[in-house]
Each structure stands twice: as C-alpha cells, then as structure tokens.
Amino acid sequence: AVEFLREKGLAAAAKKAGRIAAEGMITSFVAPDKKCGALVEVNCETDFVTKVDDFRKFAQELAEHVAVKAPKALSAETGKEGPYLLEQTLKSGATVQETVNQLVASIGEKITVRRFARFERSEPGFIQDYIHMGGKIGVLLELALEKAEAAGEEAFLNLAKDLAMQVAAAKPEYVRRDEVDEETLAKEKAIYIAQAVNEGKPEAIAEKIAQGRLEKFFKETCLEEQVYIKDNNLTVKKLLEQVASDLGAGIKIVRFARYEKGEGLAKRSDDFVGEVM
C-alpha cells in the first residue's frame, strides 16, 4: 500500500507541477539548549490546505528535521553541496520528497518545500525563533553572548524575543551597515542623486541630498539602526547596549533570517475549483 501510494504520489505530483503554489506556512524549531534552530517555508496552492492537520504536522516536523539533521541545500538542482533535504529520510522512513508526493496525492494540491535556514552556535549564544500570524511570517535570530550564564537571565530572554519581533515587523535586510555591499550602495546613491536632479537641484546639492537619503536607507534596512518598535526613543543598537550594561555581558546580533509566506512568488488568479473539477 505504501509503495502504491508513493507511485500515486509521484504521478499526482507530476500532474500538478505546473500549478502555482504561493500559499503555505512558515514553521520553526529551536533545540531546548537554544544552540541550533531552523526556519522552513512549505507552500501549497490554497490557504485551506494550511489548516489540514497532515500538512501542518509535516511542515512542523520538517523544521525540527532541518535543525537536527543539518541539510546543506534543498536538492542537487540548487547547485550547492549536500546533504540535500529532499533526499533525507524522516522518522516515518520515507524521504522528504516522498512525503511531499504522498501529501500531494492525499490532499490534491501542489505542495513544495521552498526554502530553509539553519543556525547553530558552539560558542556562548542563543538561537531565537518567532512565528507571526499562524505561519505567515517567520524569524530565526542568532545572538552571541560574552557570558554564557547570561542566557538564562529574564532581561536577555525578553530581549531575544523582542528582537525577533522587531525583525518580523520592521523587515530589516541587514544587521548593520557594514554588511551592505558596495553595488547596492552605489545603486541606491545613483537613484537618490537622479531623484534630486529631477527635483531641480544642482549636482553639488544633489550629492548632499543623496547622502542624507542614504542615511535614511541605513536606518530603514539595518536592524541595529532601526527605531525599536516598543520605544520610539531607542534604536535597536541602544537597546542592545542598555541590556548588555544591565547584564554586565556583551551582546551581539550575529545574523537573522526572515521569511514571509509566498514572497516573490506569483499568485493564483485562475479558477481553482474549476481546475480541480
């Protein structure tokens, strides 16, 4: 029966390969010791499927699997080195891809594992996750700590949660400004200069205006320079400094991943019911 379902799943998956799957959910998992964690996006065609128990269980199991088994890439097609997530075996004994095929056969929609992020720390630090709106937005955050014992302090635990919420709400692209590549900076500056010139400003003035707008760009896109969502009088960097001072231990944001369900994917606009029937 299992072999038949696998074969049926392959056939169903092939039949639905051309459909658009831009709905779905983000799931996360962090190990009890907070030393490793994962963020996963699994897509389907309609929001209805995100409420199906089998789909939700698979998406959640997959996040734990990624954290524990440490795949390097989705598949060989990515061009990156393995191990590959879709080829790895789950607790059921089926591979991730076989499980996807089985879900496609039983649910009747195209289902895809789109992407994942995995963080792990061996040095003092902490992995924090945050899922917003039932899986529409997910965040994974890595923090470095000067003193390992500070990881159990309430002030630090609250900070980790608040920073993850900050990433979810404010959509930063970088931790700090030195992470912004030169090409991006050059493009942004060129746009700002062109805008100022189009507004009738002389070139010398346009250059200064562009520099000011570049500062605004940093404040919007760099996490440490953003205004803290819970206190407009603080930047995230100042918040870090305050909590670090209270704890007597340095804190550093190492990296983060922020996934928003279906971002960058084409949306369905056709008659889904008609297609299924």
Where do the model's predicted regions map?
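N-terminal assembly/interaction segments in proteins that build large macromolecular machines
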Residues: A1-M277
